[in-house]
Amino acid sequence: MPLSTVFLLALFLILVVIVVILLARTAVFPIDTAEVEPIELTQVDGESVAQRLGLAIQLKTFSSPNLEEIDPIPFRGMHNLMHTLYPMIDEKLDKEIFNEFSLLYTWKGSNPSLEPVCFLAHLDVVPADEAEDSGWKYPPFSGIVAEGYVWGRGAIDCKGVLIGQLEAVDNLLREGYQPLRTIYLAFGFDEENSGRNGAAQMAKALQQRGVKLSFLIDEGGAITTDQIKAVSQPVAAVGVSEKGFVTLRLHAKTASGHAAMPPKRTAIGALALALATLESNPFPQNLGVVQFMLSHLGKALPFMQRMALANTWLFGGLVRKQMASQPTMNALTRTTLAPTVINGGHTSNVLPAEADALINLRIMEGETREEVFQRVNNMVADDVISVLPSDAETLQESRSWNPSPVSEVDSPQFALLANLIMAAYPSTLVMPILVAGGTDARYYAPFCRNAYRFSPFVLSTEETANVHGVNERLSIANCAKAVGFYMELMRHVSSLTAEEEAAFLSEDEWEEDEKPVKERKNKAPRASKVVEPEEVLIAELHTPLPTKPLKQPASQTVAYPKQPRQVESPTEEHLTSRSENFVEDLQPLQDDDEPLTVKPMKRG
């Protein structure tokens, strides 16, 4: 046989082997989930809920890292409003106040031997520009209900979640519902400023009492209809972990002087060079998280994308490039770094002796704040530039934290949550995600393995972008459905018995082990089978269990007054009046997410 023929035959066989490997790995990549029967949620008057949410939005509950800087009046107004709108909650549940503003409610279950469940939200919001030319269609603290939405700061983050949970508890109390497991409602007041004085203190108190939580849900991902362009179905993003956080200060110090006779290195020039160097040398990518997330979309993900993600040994470079080109996906593949504040110089003809910049880093799963600090320090620190924590002398004392532990996705608690989402929002896919921002849930991680971050809202890309931005709003339909969702979730997670929990964890394993290999169900493969050895996966390569049908409770319709319940005078004095006047609709400001192309510069 001619040598050329042998070569071609060998090449053909190699190609066949490669194709077989590609197809085999692609075949086991998606995690297919059994279909769940749709359920009807409790019918709720969404407009009444929106009106009550509007009252909460009117309160300018701004937090601060320092307790003494917080205006107490809006928070007291919020407490009074909650008492006025939901008096039965104060009557039936035990209430504790932490650090003056945080609220911890305890709804005692009938079986105290079972681990409790916890629902989180926060009272505080970020500020909003109230100027007439700010771009808000309606004033940001009007709480006005118009065009099918309730408008204002905090509508989504996080007063919509807060009111949804309170409405759900109020409705269940009026139905006479008695939970099997104790239910905690934990509402912090400084989530937007790290949660140290709010959620952290409530979590500490619970842990000191020996509480171990069976389940916890906080704000987080939502149901989006157009964020994953390749998938036509709605996707519910459920946070199972969150990135770490640290802000570092770059400090440049040189001799001051006259601008007419600059030295070789100036403070501002050295600082600019350091920032350019950091932005041009991003942290390394890790595709494990993205693989884990997208595998849960099953075959809804197009074949070519599944093949690329399942075979990063061949397509890794292409996948990394694609991920890096999208800010949202890029944040899920690496620790991100962003300069946020810069200071230096006071007049045009004087060289400042010092200049500073703050850089915010969101730390990837598998890395620590100490490692991140060391990398930044090694890259830019020298005799002019020093790297320091932004608000303390040491990292341990600073407002920073490591990535949170990864919650279970093969637990009955996650299955209940995922099944309820799919049943309440038919055709929706459930995808575990790594949350890029910070939530209060991380403080409860030491005593809760099943902590999830999900807000039961169906949001467009625009609505998601408006969180912390201009024209934040929540639809009346979302207001109604969120209440029904929380009611069902509270029913299911609080009624989970120890026997059901044990059966869930053992039933499928026993059944699968007893069957011959060929007869076993097509169980979802562990994500470790589709990633390269060097990839570190979120969730320690969990395998979700097949879904189980939800128990459909008797459907009940909650009767609401046509008008929102009146607020008693102690609250009214702290509420701003609703204004019917509003500014014209302006184009919302757009963020420029284009990455810099600056390359590291040689220092002279």
What are the roles of these predicted feature ranges?
Residues 166, 506, 511, 569, ...:
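Intrinsically disordered, low-complexity serine/threonine-rich segments
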Residues 149-150, 154-237, 513:
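Acidic/histidine-rich catalytic neighborhood of metal-dependent amide-processing enzymes
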Residues 116-117, 214-215, 451:
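Structural motif
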Residues 536-542, 550-604:
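Long, low-complexity, intrinsically disordered segments
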Residues 8, 12-153, 174-180:
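Acidic/His- and Gly-rich active-site-bordering loop/insert found
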Residues 2-46, 51, 221-241, 245-487, ...:
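Metal-dependent amide/peptide-bond hydrolase catalytic core
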